Amino acid sequence: MANEFTQIGNIEAGTAPTTEQVDQIYEIIANAPESEQADLIKELADQYPDSGGEILSAIIEANPDDAADIAITTAEALPEAAAEVAAAVAEVVPEAATEIATQMAQTNPEAAQAAAQAIVEANPEAAAEVAIAMAEAAP
């Protein structure tokens, strides 16, 4: 599975990937068997060590129907990107953000605090709901 992302091209830290790059990366991850998706996200982070969270956030923005799957797999594979991905979820699908953050926390309790904080920062009105959900998901 190594080198899945070699044809994507360079993505500089702090620079958003192009639409074409987002589409290519999404296709690679989405078309992989579910059992390989976490490994692909890790490989993406290895290939683009300073941009992994930003790239995954761009993928969520471009594919809101898959936001939950991408966010949960990211919490499992790349917990250091959980906050950035949760913030993208809160922007793209705010009505599902608490539920998705809860699933992220159940997948990886270490990602719970960062995900919850990002959701609350993006949507302060949801603070109580997020706090209750996180307490239940990752006591």
Task: Give the label of every model feature segment.
Residues 1-139:
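General marker for long, soluble alpha-helical cores
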